[in-house]
């Protein structure tokens, strides 16, 4: 059994390709379809904090429309606590387009 977890979006080609690469390399990850089972607020904060530590900016795509809304740039680093309220209270429907992997 692998200790890899993939937060997967089956509609996303990148996520499907990543899952295929994991399988092709003999890994059997735990698969969480985050669109069907979204993490709670606390789970998401812990997950992002565990993966990115103080570099939350690394988990937001440079092209993401949230970058200007949060006054972020790819050079800056942001503490998760400083933006999580905005992300969780964001009014428009944001459709996640990629899965991500947690190893460990």
Curated annotation (Swiss-Prot):
GO BP annotations of the record are: response to arsenic-containing substance
EC number(s) reported in the record: 1.20.4.1
Reaction equations catalysed: [glutaredoxin]-dithiol + arsenate + glutathione + H(+) = glutathionyl-S-S-[glutaredoxin] + arsenite + H2O
**What is the top EC class of this enzyme, as a single word?**
oxidoreductase
Under SUPFAM superfamilies, the record lists: Thioredoxin-like
Catalytic residue list:
12
Task: Please tell me whether the keyword RNA-binding is annotated for this protein.
Answer: no
Q: Which UniProt keywords apply?
A: Arsenical resistance, Oxidoreductase
A GO molecular-function term, please?
Answer: arsenate reductase (glutaredoxin) activity
- Superkingdom as given in the UniProt entry: Bacteria
* Ranges annotated as spanning the membrane: none
Provide the function of this protein: Reduction of arsenate [As(V)] to arsenite [As(III)]. This protein expands the substrate specificity of ArsAB pump which can extrude arsenite and antimonite to allow for arsenate pumping and resistance.
What other note does the entry give for this protein?
Answer: Is missing about 40 C-terminal residues compared to paralogs.
Family, according to the entry, reads as follows: Belongs to the ArsC family.
Recorded protein name is Putative arsenate reductase
What is the protein's species of origin? Escherichia coli (strain K12)
Q: Provide the organism lineage as a comma list.
A: Bacteria, Pseudomonadati, Pseudomonadota, Gammaproteobacteria, Enterobacterales
Q: Which gene name belongs to this protein?
A: yfjU
